[in-house]
């Protein structure tokens, strides 16, 4: 499993070419908190919407704790996406280590 820590992602987001962020959580979860500029594709819609992603882009997937996004990362790798990472610990770890102002749930 190729994962990226919250601190590594924070650093990558300030790069000239940041990764594409994809939030795989449910709609209600995105209303509580989310990362700026993330594309929201709920896990159950992924098969129908995968064409919205470029297989050549660096993609970082996230969810609440990293479990659902890990499953989607494996799915994308199986489709030939080369640079796919899962946010280790999801937004829960992000809120504890990078952004303590983010709402936790």
Each language-model region and where it sits:
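Rhodanese-like catalytic fold shared by cysteine-dependent sulfurtransferases
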Residues: 1-20, 24-58, 67-105
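Short, surface-exposed ligand- or partner-binding patches at beta-edge/loop junctions that are enriched
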Residues: 62-63
């Amino acid at each position: 499993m190729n994962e990226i820590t919250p601190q590594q992602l924070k650093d990558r987001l300030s790069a000239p070419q940041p990764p594409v962020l994809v939030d795989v959580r449910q709609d209600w979860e995105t209303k509580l908190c989310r990362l700026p500029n993330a594309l929201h594709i709920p896990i159950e819609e992924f098969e129908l919407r995968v064409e919205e992603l470029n297989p050549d882009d660096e993609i970082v997937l996230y969810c609440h704790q990293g479990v659902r996004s890990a499953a989607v990362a494996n799915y994308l790798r199986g489709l030939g996406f080369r640079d796919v990472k899962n946010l280790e610990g999801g937004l829960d770890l992000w809120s504890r280590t990078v952004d303590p102002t983010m709402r936790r749930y």
